[in-house]
Amino acid sequence: MKKNTLGLPLEYEKLSEYFDARNIGDDTDAKNSVIERLLKTYKVQTVLDLTCGTGSQVFFLTKRGYKCVGADFSPALLEIARKRAHEEKVAIKFIDGDMRTLRVGRFDAVISIFNAVGHLTKVGFEKTMKNVHQNLKAGGIYIFDILNLEAMTDAVVADLAYCTHKKFNGTQMHLVQFSTINRNNGRLTSYDNYIVQKNAAKPEKFGNKFSLQIYTAKELVTTQKIEVTTLGQAISGYLNGNVW
């Protein structure tokens, strides 16, 4: 997996087996339903997920009749997705690739969810937007979500601090996280400290730092010609292939 300028969560590689435990929550079904509603509106049949991770969106959409391809630049997460597809006997093609450069074909829709584009620098985001266009049919749409810089008040950033303890499959994971924001460059930085114990083994400690590049809705509309909807702390947006 390529190095990332802004850093990445440990679950993308070293702790990939805990990705779903940390990232898949009560809001996942709600996000998937919003995506499906947009796909129906634009009569989408084929979908490319450029940042599929372990496959949350592509499994959901495939089971609803969409023809999906999943891609990610984390081999560890793709291994989990491929294993699940085999176990559930679901026909989904998974591809190793970087959303900034990967060319797969032409699709009715391209998606990247869970703040995936926030892991890119502004230059990387620009490259991704151009590459998305190369993977879309004429009139196709790009759906993504990202944090809304205007909504990230000091109180909201402070509220991102949390401590959680999860137990699953004989493993216990304790995570403490807090975040800071630089409003001058629009970067939200998270600091993670993990304690992981597998069965009765000696607990392991992991520390990590990564940043998200976030934007105001105005920035996205002005620089990328993206239609956006602000949803409190988040921005959901889509690019129509006809207006690039």
Question: What is each residue range found by the language model?
Answer:
Residues 139-146:
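Conserved beta-strand signature within the Rossmann-like core of class I S-adenosyl-L-methionine
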Residues 108-124:
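A short SAM/SAH-binding and catalytic strip from SAM-dependent methyltransferases
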Residues 126-138:
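A short glycine-rich, Lys/Arg-flanked "PGG" loop and its adjoining helix->strand segment in the class I
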Residues 1-45:
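Conserved class I S-adenosyl-L-methionine
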Residues 51:
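Conserved S-adenosyl-L-methionine
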Residues 100-109:
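A short acidic, Gly/Pro-enriched loop at the edge of an enzyme's catalytic core
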Residues 146-221:
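SAM-dependent methyltransferase
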Residues 55-101:
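Class I SAM-dependent methyltransferase SAM/SAH-binding core
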